[in-house]
Amino acid sequence: MGGKWSKSSVIGWPTVRERMRRAEPAADGVGAASQDLEKHGAITSSNTAATNADCAWLEAQEEEEVGFPVTPQVPLRPMTYKAAVDLSHFLKEKGGLEGLIHSQRRQDILDLWIYHTQGYFPDWQNYTPGPGIRYPLTFGWCYKLVPVEPEKLEEANKGENTSLLHPVSLHGMDDPEREVLEWRFDSRLAFHHVARELHPEYFKNC
């Protein structure tokens, strides 16, 4: 009567059904491609390399040698609140990000590593504009970008073996406000979505 679909033992369906049931919503503040992934389970034709900067950036990375394959080894998915909190605490525990001088290249490497190993589409690590502290748009990500004090910069630039291409020596060339920024962990960001309060206009389509 119902044809082949009436059989409850359709191959793989119980697993897929369970995955759908457990799927978490995308975190507030992720980009358009991740919102697509949440709603449709895939990136649709409304987000292509021609129309979406994050998709174009990701496509360009496939041409570059970044030290690991760009194609994720796990299913593609949007960053969730829980995943952002867990990732923040994992990085805090392992060390290496706290106090690291921010540069776009370093952020790209982090985004690609997370995309490759965890499958999270790299449009979630965005911050409020400057000057001053930049708060994460994605709720659950507990790292903000904080301007480095001038004394600390001076100290870091002393000595003959300072690399001119090191982010601390570039004097904020990556930043529209010309500020040198560092990643700083703040556990309160897991409970307080500062970016949404400061810039509600960024969240109209969420």
UniProtKB/Swiss-Prot annotation:
**Residue ranges for motif PxxP?**
72-75
Q: Name one GO biological process term.
A: symbiont-mediated suppression of host antigen processing and presentation of peptide antigen via MHC class I
Name of the protein in question? Protein Nef
Q: What does this protein do?
A: Factor of infectivity and pathogenicity, required for optimal virus replication. Alters numerous pathways of T-lymphocyte function and down-regulates immunity surface molecules in order to evade host defense and increase viral infectivity. Alters the functionality of other immunity cells, like dendritic cells, monocytes/macrophages and NK cells. In infected CD4(+) T-lymphocytes, down-regulates the surface MHC-I, mature MHC-II, CD4, CD28, CCR5 and CXCR4 molecules. Mediates internalization and degradation of host CD4 through the interaction of with the cytoplasmic tail of CD4, the recruitment of AP-2 (clathrin adapter protein complex 2), internalization through clathrin coated pits, and subsequent transport to endosomes and lysosomes for degradation. Diverts host MHC-I molecules to the trans-Golgi network-associated endosomal compartments by an endocytic pathway to finally target them for degradation.
Region listing for SH3-binding, in residue ranges:
69-78
Sorted keywords for this record are: AIDS, Apoptosis, Early protein, Host cell membrane, Host Golgi apparatus, Host membrane, Host-virus interaction, Inhibition of host adaptive immune response by virus, Inhibition of host autophagy by virus, Inhibition of host MHC class I molecule presentation by virus, Inhibition of host MHC class II molecule presentation by virus, Lipoprotein, Membrane, Myristate, Phosphoprotein, Secreted, SH3-binding, Viral immunoevasion, Virion, Virulence
More info: HIV-1 lineages are divided in three main groups, M (for Major), O (for Outlier), and N (for New, or Non-M, Non-O). The vast majority of strains found worldwide belong to the group M. Group O seems to be endemic to and largely confined to Cameroon and neighboring countries in West Central Africa, where these viruses represent a small minority of HIV-1 strains. The group N is represented by a limited number of isolates from Cameroonian persons. The group M is further subdivided in 9 clades or subtypes (A to D, F to H, J and K).
Q: Where is this site: Cleavage?
A: W57, L58
What information about domains appears in the record's comments?
The N-terminal domain is composed of the N-myristoyl glycine and of a cluster of positively charged amino acids. It is required for inner plasma membrane targeting of Nef and virion incorporation, and thereby for infectivity. This domain is also involved in binding to TP53.
